[in-house]
Amino acid sequence: MKYFVVALALAVALVCIAESTAYDVNEELENELDDLSDAAWLAKAAEDLQALDDFEESEESRSMWSGMWRRKLKKLRNALKKKLKGEK
């Protein structure tokens, strides 16, 4: 009987220790879900970057950038003309 009480006390002690130091399963699942959502976000960002790289090589992109530079250079040319006319 004495051994039974000691074994029972040890079992209860081990259960209490395991209960107090165990990780919460829900918390682990939430962490895994966060990791999955982060991975999904990173995958989407990688796809968007790839699409952007493809866009930069397209004819539409080149015409957009050339149009932007053309407008900017035209604006600078007009500003230079105004400045030169004002100095004369």
From Swiss-Prot:
Protein name per the record: M-zodatoxin-Lt1a
Motif Processing quadruplet motif: where in chain: 59-62
Family to which the UniProt record says this protein belongs: Belongs to the cationic peptide 03 (latarcin) family. 01 subfamily.
Q: Name one GO molecular function term.
A: toxin activity
Would you kindly state one Gene Ontology biological process term found in this protein's UniProt entry?
defense response to fungus
A Pfam family per the record: Latarcin
**Distribution of this protein across tissues and organs:** Expressed by the venom gland.
